[in-house]
């Protein structure tokens, strides 16, 4: 393949510089961030996400989880996407991430498509995650789950495996630990219960719920017996079970399951103990009112997406979401 001439390289540099200069440098996120610089950015992301979900419906949950795991580790900055190299340690091999987060190839696909229509690296990988999560929720849940994503994040040049290990909530957390974990991110009880509704889609590995189905009493015995068929006491760590009975639809079955002690994860069932707590009341509300769940879920997703974003001239806009420039 012929190499690029110095003139061509210079023209590309000038183009990228001009495009970058058009991007607002204020620190406020806004849904209109790309309206002028690249109006086709968001429709392009939605198109790629839609085709990815049509290929594999599970990918919607994976993209939502990526956004969550990104934001809870030093803010929504795309750090979760960075690969390990001989001189750089990313977050992908942190205990809460390994064998859990996936969908990186779809993010690569989105990045390539967006850079093509924008004629350069205009949209950050962090904004791609936030938008892909929204599109996944809206595609799998319908119009009531659509919301305007706030945009303008930039990408981190660093990552922290230690922070990922420390900051991401464990499926074995009790209620107090969950509250403390979310509070450290500026999120409250309503955010905890609403965002946990992300488990209305997706699957869990046997290793994350084995102890619950064999050793806990706060679980429907028939439900526990059904889970034991796919999750033996020994072996089968990577066997999957849906987090609720409709793992490819965003709706409120997850909350109804909690009322009957059918939460797959220990941390899920901690949200409802039938003692009249604030979280109990929210679970009861969402279990019978999908619109209330949708409204609070969207509000909390927007709030989560505002956790310590890099803006203005902080960080960078990556050429490749898997590595820094």
Swiss-Prot record:
EC number of this enzyme: 1.11.1.7
GO biological process: hydrogen peroxide catabolic process; nodulation; response to oxidative stress
Localization (cell): Secreted
Tissue localization of expression: Expressed in the differentiating root epidermis following inoculation with the bacterial symbiont Sinorhizobium meliloti.
Active site positions, chain numbering: 69
Pfam families hit by this protein: peroxidase
Positions annotated to bind Ca(2+) 2: 200, 244, 246, 251
Binding-site residues, heme b: 199
GO molecular function: heme binding; lactoperoxidase activity; metal ion binding
Binding of substrate, residues: 169
Broad class of where this protein is predominantly found: secreted
Disulfide bond positions: 38-118, 71-76, 125-321, 206-231
Keywords: Calcium, Disulfide bond, Glycoprotein, Heme, Hydrogen peroxide, Iron, Metal-binding, Nodulation, Oxidoreductase, Peroxidase, Secreted, Signal
Residues flagged as site, Transition state stabilizer: 65
Residues spanning the signal sequence: 1-21
Cofactor note text: Binds 1 heme b (iron(II)-protoporphyrin IX) group per subunit. Binds 2 calcium ions per subunit.
Induction remarks: Induced rapidly and transiently by the Sinorhizobium meliloti synthesized lipochitooligosaccharide signal molecule (Nod factor RmlV) in early steps of nodulation, during the preinfection period, prior to the colonization by S.meliloti and nodule morphogenesis. Triggered by reactive oxygen species (ROS) such as hydrogen peroxide H(2)O(2), possibly in response to S.meliloti in the nodulation zone of roots.
Catalytic activity entry: 2 a phenolic donor + H2O2 = 2 a phenolic radical donor + 2 H2O
Cofactor: heme b; Ca(2+)
Binding-site residues, Ca(2+) 1: 70, 73, 75, 77, 79
Glycosylation: residue positions: 87, 174, 215
PANTHER family: PEROXIDASE 72-RELATED (PTHR31388), PEROXIDASE RIP1 (PTHR31388:SF123)
Stated role: Removal of H(2)O(2), oxidation of toxic reductants, biosynthesis and degradation of lignin, suberization, auxin catabolism, response to environmental stresses such as wounding, pathogen attack and oxidative stress. These functions might be dependent on each isozyme/isoform in each plant tissue.
Family classification: Belongs to the peroxidase family. Classical plant (class III) peroxidase subfamily.
Annotated protein name in UniProt: Peroxidase RIP1
Organism of this sequence: Medicago truncatula (Barrel medic)
Biological classification of the source: Eukaryota, Viridiplantae, Streptophyta, Embryophyta, Tracheophyta
């Amino acid at each position: 393949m012929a190499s690029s001439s110095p003139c061509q390289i210079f023209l590309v540099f000038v183009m990228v510089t001009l495009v970058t200069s058009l991007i607002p440098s204020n620190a406020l996120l806004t849904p209109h961030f790309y309206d002028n610089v690249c109006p086709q950015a968001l429709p392009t992301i939605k198109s790629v996400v839609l085709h990815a979900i049509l290929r594999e419906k599970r990918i919607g949950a994976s993209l939502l989880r990526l956004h969550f795991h990104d934001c809870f580790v030093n803010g929504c900055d795309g750090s979760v996407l960075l690969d390990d190299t001989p001189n750089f340690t990313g977050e992908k091999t942190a205990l809460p991430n390994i064998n859990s987060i996936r969908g990186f190839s779809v993010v690569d696909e989105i990045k390539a498509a967006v850079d093509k229509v924008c004629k350069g690296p205009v949209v950050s990988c962090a904004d791609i995650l936030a938008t892909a999560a929204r599109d996944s929720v809206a595609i799998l849940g319908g119009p009531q789950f659509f919301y305007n994503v706030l945009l303008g994040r930039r990408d981190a040049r660093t990552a922290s495996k230690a922070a990922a290990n420390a900051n991401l909530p464990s499926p074995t957390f009790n209620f107090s630990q969950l509250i403390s974990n979310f509070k450290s991110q500026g999120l409250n009880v309503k955010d905890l219960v609403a965002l946990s509704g992300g488990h209305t889609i997706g699957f869990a590995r046997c290793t994350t719920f084995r102890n619950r189905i064999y050793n806990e009493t706060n679980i429907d015995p028939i439900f526990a017996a059904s889970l034991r068929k796919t999750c033996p006491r020994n072996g089968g760590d990577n066997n999957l079970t849906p987090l609720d009975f409709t793992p490819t639809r965003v709706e409120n079955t997850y909350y109804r399951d909690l009322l009957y002690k059918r939460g797959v994860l220990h941390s899920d069932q901690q949200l409802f103990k039938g003692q009249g707590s604030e979280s109990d009341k929210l679970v009861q509300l969402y279990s019978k009112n999908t619109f209330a769940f949708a409204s609070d879920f969207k509000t909390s997703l927007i709030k989560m997406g505002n956790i310590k974003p890099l803006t203005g001239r902080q960080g960078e806009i990556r050429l490749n979401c898997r590595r820094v420039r």
